[in-house]
């Protein structure tokens, strides 16, 4: 440009260090701008196998390049010199973080038996700082997921029990209840600790997981730090009141895991389920929402149903792939049945109905029932 008498005209030139590759253009929404203005922490987390993300205290955003047809110039306000010219900017999109990576990380060191505690304690689980460094997610989302995974804190390290070990400890607790003629809402914690050969805090952890009142002491990192007993309505710290529904689901999972390769007929499953429970507990299939569904036993007799166990945690994390696998399990779904298997993959800002219609289409059966089938 050349100067003239117009005061609005500016002379800009290229700086001596052009192009300065230290600069990037970032398109930020008001929330991110407020974080910057208020000196809040923003963290960019990279990965060798995945794209980088930007994390606030409670949200996670992908960082992707958005190209433009025109060059954008970054000009120093003080010198009017061009620092860099770019034809792209970085766009932020809020996402559901891939927290299955956190589950895989914790279960890579899951406690599978009592002997694991005889090893170096530093080899058990992970510290919160280690988790934060490795997982591409905000701290709050990580904390919430740690609670969902029923982690416990042992000497400032986050630990999970393998499903087999957790089931084994609860099985021993229920066996002690039978031997001692204890009611399930009146389990003496000290007797469990005395009679079961397992670390005390593991026994207390399992009692809390399956009790009516789960009141963990939260360390701020999302785990459960065992301080005392389960507790009942009388606040007796030595008494744990087991939740009948949780015990029902535990027994159902045992049956479903054993029969995972061959679906059980509904009537057989319900009979076997009842046989594993005390007489005062009456199971209902609705308890298994998000765990199992009913599918036709055969194409020739669609009215006869079988029970299909679905482990939501091992389904694909990519929505399209998850829907594809679910429709391979059953060609028709009700929204109520499919919701627990897809809700963890719904992008922020999307409604359940909007998300479902992206990958499926609604139909009405001959009996007037509203269902969804695959769109692909």
Curated annotation (Swiss-Prot):
Its main location: nucleus. Residues 213-232 are annotated as: Disordered. It comes from the Eukaryota. The keyword Nucleotide-binding does not apply. GO terms for molecular function: DNA binding. Residues 219-232 have a biased composition (Gly residues). GO terms for biological process: DNA replication; maintenance of mitotic sister chromatid cohesion; regulation of DNA replication. Belongs to the DCC1 family. Loads PCNA onto primed templates regulating velocity, spacing and restart activity of replication forks. May couple DNA replication to sister chromatid cohesion. PANTHER family: SISTER CHROMATID COHESION PROTEIN DCC1, SISTER CHROMATID COHESION PROTEIN DCC1-RELATED. This is Probable sister chromatid cohesion protein DCC1. The lineage of its organism: Eukaryota, Amoebozoa, Evosea, Eumycetozoa, Dictyostelia.
């Amino acid at each position: 440009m050349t100067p003239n008498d117009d005061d609005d005209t500016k002379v800009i030139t290229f700086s001596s260090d052009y192009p300065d590759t230290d600069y990037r253009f970032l398109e930020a929404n008001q929330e991110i701008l407020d974080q910057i203005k208020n000196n809040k922490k923003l963290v960019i987390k990279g990965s060798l196998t995945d794209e980088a993300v930007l994390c606030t205290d409670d949200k996670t955003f992908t960082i992707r390049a958005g190209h433009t047809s025109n060059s954008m110039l970054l000009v120093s306000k003080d010198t009017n010199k061009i620092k860099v010219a770019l034809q792209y900017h970085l766009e932020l999109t809020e996402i559901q973080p891939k927290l299955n990576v956190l589950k895989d990380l914790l279960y890579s060191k899951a406690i599978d038996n009592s002997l694991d505690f005889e090893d170096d304690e530093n080899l058990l689980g992970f510290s919160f700082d280690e988790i934060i460094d490795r997982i591409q997610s905000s701290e709050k989302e990580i904390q919430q997921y740690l609670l969902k995974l029923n982690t416990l804190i042992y000497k400032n390290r986050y630990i999970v029990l393998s499903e087999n070990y957790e089931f084994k400890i609860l099985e021993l607790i229920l066996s002690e209840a039978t031997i001692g003629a204890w009611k399930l809402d009146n389990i003496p914690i000290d007797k469990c600790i005395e009679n079961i050969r397992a670390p005390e805090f593991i026994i207390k952890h399992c009692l809390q997981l399956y009790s009516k009142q789960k009141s963990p002491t939260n360390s701020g990192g999302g785990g459960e730090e065992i301080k005392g007993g389960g507790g009942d309505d009388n606040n007796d710290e030595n008494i744990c009141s087991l939740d009948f529904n949780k015990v029902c689901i535990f027994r159902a999972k045992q049956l479903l895991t054993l029969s995972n390769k061959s679906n059980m007929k509904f009537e057989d499953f319900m009979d076997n389920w009842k046989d594993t429970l005390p007489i005062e507990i009456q199971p209902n299939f609705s308890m298994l929402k998000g765990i199992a569904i009913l599918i036709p036993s055969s194409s020739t007799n669609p009215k006869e149903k079988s029970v299909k166990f679905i482990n939501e945690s091992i389904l694909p994390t990519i929505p399209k792939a998850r829907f594809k696998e679910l429709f391979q399990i059953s060609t028709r779904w009700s929204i109520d049945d499919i919701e627990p298997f897809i809700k963890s993959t719904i992008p922020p800002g999307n409604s359940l109905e909007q998300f479902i219609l992206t990958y499926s289409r609604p139909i009405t059966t001959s009996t007037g029932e509203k269902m969804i089938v695959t769109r692909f």
